[in-house]
């Protein structure tokens, strides 16, 4: 981007942890990056504080009832930032000339429409919303290709693969990719010990600072399962060419093995600002605020196979990928409902994979031809899982 104009960046999900990391990187490079659009779900006060700090042209609150609070708050701050509310406003801005780059960091299936809108408009899409790929990966990648949109993954694992693959003309020379997993806070525990896990314990991740939903997904290994499905869509690889290794130090973010016997790995400290800096500046490199990796002080790098008996969510994700069609959408939706119930104390930790498996075995698989089909599968999976929860409550 040397000598070019400012990159106009929309940060969707600005009040979350990924949004904060993105804004940190953007603020370090005022000569090349500008936060032009900021969005939040319902945290209007947090959004106003971010607007005061970054002075975007547009601010969006997803909860339309909070529009007056956002509008009046911006006026009170003396900001020229234009207030918007609702999902339609978000989608419109994603596709408008208000931005050329979108950081898609809205959690859950709610982030899909704006992600698709950005892809349709040919934007550079920094994808942190894994549900977009899991729910509608085929549709999203097809849309992006047709419109010339560039998808750069922000997950540390997929960013690592992206960087390794872009280091050469890989073509058909990839034998397999290996995603690494920290193993979560309960690595090494058996199912009996996992039965007693509390929500507070599950959200305390040993390596990464994350929101509650993704922290639980990391603890169940569903996060890694979703990443396997993502990798399939991002890099065009079948499930048989995607492996997972548990790596407790979280320093090797992923590896790519080539047909000539070479293996490339990307290493770095566990900080999302690195991958966001990659996405914001690619193919250039810019300062992210993250220090270098001192391997001597780290001491050792350990690797082990994931325990899919204790953590069946990873196996369920592979099953859904093999089934194809709407199965990944069902997996994702059932998991969202199950994790929410666990965080609210309605069910135990082991109920999460049980509820997901129930939805996968109950609902028929359909071809994932349209967004409507996928959203219908998503809604069905939520209903089936909610009914299973109600049944659980009656018999608890």
From Swiss-Prot:
Binding site for NADPH: 15-18, 41, 129, 131, 211
GO molecular function: 1-deoxy-D-xylulose-5-phosphate reductoisomerase activity; manganese ion binding; NADPH binding
Any one of the GO BP annotations: isopentenyl diphosphate biosynthetic process, methylerythritol 4-phosphate pathway involved in terpenoid biosynthetic process
UniProt cross-references to Gene3D superfamilies, sorted A to Z: 1.10.1740.10, NAD(P)-binding Rossmann-like Domain (3.40.50.720)
Catalytic activity as recorded in UniProt: 2-C-methyl-D-erythritol 4-phosphate + NADP(+) = 1-deoxy-D-xylulose 5-phosphate + NADPH + H(+)
The protein's required cofactors: Mg(2+); Mn(2+)
Keywords: Isoprene biosynthesis, Manganese, Metal-binding, NADP, Oxidoreductase
Binding positions (Mn(2+)): 155, 157, 227
EC number(s) on file: 1.1.1.267
Pathway: Isoprenoid biosynthesis; isopentenyl diphosphate biosynthesis via DXP pathway; isopentenyl diphosphate from 1-deoxy-D-xylulose 5-phosphate: step 1/6
Secretion signal span: none
Cross-referenced InterPro entries: DXP_reductoisomerase, DXP_reductoisomerase_C, DXP_reductoisomerase_N, DXPR_C, DXPR_C_sf, NAD(P)-bd_dom_sf
Binding site for 1-deoxy-D-xylulose 5-phosphate: 130, 156-157, 182, 205, 218, 223-224, 227
Superkingdom assignment: Bacteria
Enzyme class: oxidoreductase
NCBIfam families with a match to the protein in the record: Dxr, PRK12464.1
HAMAP family registered for this protein in UniProt: DXP_reductoisom
Record-stated family: Belongs to the DXR family.
General function of this protein: Catalyzes the NADPH-dependent rearrangement and reduction of 1-deoxy-D-xylulose-5-phosphate (DXP) to 2-C-methyl-D-erythritol 4-phosphate (MEP).
Name of this chain's protein: 1-deoxy-D-xylulose 5-phosphate reductoisomerase
Species whose genome carries this gene: Xanthomonas oryzae pv. oryzae (strain PXO99A)
Gene: dxr
């Amino acid at each position: 981007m040397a000598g070019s104009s400012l990159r106009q960046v929309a940060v969707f999900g600005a009040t979350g942890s990924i949004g904060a990391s993105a804004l940190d990187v953007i603020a370090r490079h005022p000569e090349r990056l500008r936060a032009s659009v900021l969005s939040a779900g319902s945290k209007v006060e947090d959004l106003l504080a971010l607007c005061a700090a970054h002075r975007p042209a547009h601010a969006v609150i997803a909860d339309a009832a909070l529009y007056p609070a956002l509008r009046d708050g911006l006026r009170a701050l003396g900001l020229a930032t234009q207030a918007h509310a609702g999902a339609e406003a978000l989608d419109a801005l994603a596709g408008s000339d208000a931005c050329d780059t979108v950081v898609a960091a809205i959690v859950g299936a709610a982030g899909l429409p704006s992600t698709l809108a950005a892809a349709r408009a040919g934007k550079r899409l920094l994808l942190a919303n894994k549900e977009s790929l899991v729910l509608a990966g085929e549709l999203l990648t097809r849309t992006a290709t047709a419109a010339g949109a560039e998808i750069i993954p922000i997950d540390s694992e997929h960013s690592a693969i992206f960087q390794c693959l872009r280091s050469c003309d890989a073509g058909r020379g990839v034998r397999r990719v290996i995603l690494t997993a920290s193993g979560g806070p309960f690595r090494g525990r058996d199912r009996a010990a996992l039965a007693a896990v509390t929500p507070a314990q599950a959200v305390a991740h040993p390596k990464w600072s994350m929101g509650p939903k993704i922290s639980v997904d990391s603890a169940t290994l569903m996060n890694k399962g979703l990443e396997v499905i993502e990798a399939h869509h991002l890099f065009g690889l079948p499930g048989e060419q995607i492996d997972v290794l548990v790596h407790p130090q979280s320093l090797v973010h992923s590896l790519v093995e080539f047909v000539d016997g070479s293996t490339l790995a990307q290493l770095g400290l566990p900080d999302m600002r690195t991958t966001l800096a990659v996405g914001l500046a690619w193919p250039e490199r810019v300062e992210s605020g993250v220090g270098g990796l001192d391997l001597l002080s780290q001491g050792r790098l350990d690797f082990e196979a994931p325990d899919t008996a204790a953590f069946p969510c990873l196996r369920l994700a592979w099953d859904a990928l093999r089934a194809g069609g709407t199965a990944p959408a069902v997996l994702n939706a059932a998991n969202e409902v199950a994790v929410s119930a666990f965080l609210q104390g309605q069910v135990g930790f082991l109920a999460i994979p049980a509820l997901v498996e129930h939805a996968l075995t109950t609902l028929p698989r359909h071809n994932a031809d349209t967004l409507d089909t996928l959203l219908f599968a998503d809604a069905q999976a939520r209903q089936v899982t909610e009914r299973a929860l109600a049944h659980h409550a009656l018999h608890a």
